[in-house]
């Protein structure tokens, strides 16, 4: 059910986020994530911070990749061209040709498969898998908070996060040119449940010292 899939684009990502991520040892990738655990199935699509040492961090340019983490095989990465003009056109053309071949041979092949399978026992329905709500998923987060440039603002931000039991793991706050009216406070948090982060961001956004939209980028799971 794709209607239940959480999807977030990249429009909120700025060049400064890429630079801050690099300083923190990460790269920003737009990921589709599926995790099956005892709690159920997590499915989501959003920008994520990937450690520079991770396999996915090396996927660049027109390359796309699928990383699979399993108990038996550990981490495996499958990559190939699939983004950009020529690479996308090639992939689409391959799909069209494959579909055309399937349609052309469908009648004979379908009849043959029906004869082969009619005596086979039918498989039962797949077991239901519970879906983990986005609000219940825990992630470490990168927060870029635009604030007025005056003393005491960071203490306000830290207090608001602490009120929601969110720990600060790293901070970047750079001096801005005198002509700039605002300054960005960049914070890396511990792993926190999504609903808690949302509540904290709502409180932060209500502060009169926060002067713009807060950017939040989740850290990709490292199973």
Q: Each predicted region: which residue ranges?
A:
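Substrate-binding/catalytic subdomain of NAD(P)-dependent oxidoreductase enzymes
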Residues: 1-58, 63-65
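Conserved active-site and cofactor/substrate-binding residues in soluble primary-metabolism enzymes
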Residues: 5, 9-16, 60-63, 83, ...
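Glycine-rich phosphate/pyrophosphate-binding beta-alpha loops
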Residues: 52, 75-86
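Short gly/pro-enriched beta-turn/loop segments at secondary-structure junctions
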Residues: 61-63, 71-73, 136-140
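An anion-binding loop in the catalytic cleft
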Residues: 68-79, 93
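Short acidic, glycine/serine/threonine-rich loops at helix termini
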Residues: 80, 90, 104
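A conserved regulatory-domain signal marking ACT and ACT-like small-molecule sensing domains
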Residues: 96-223
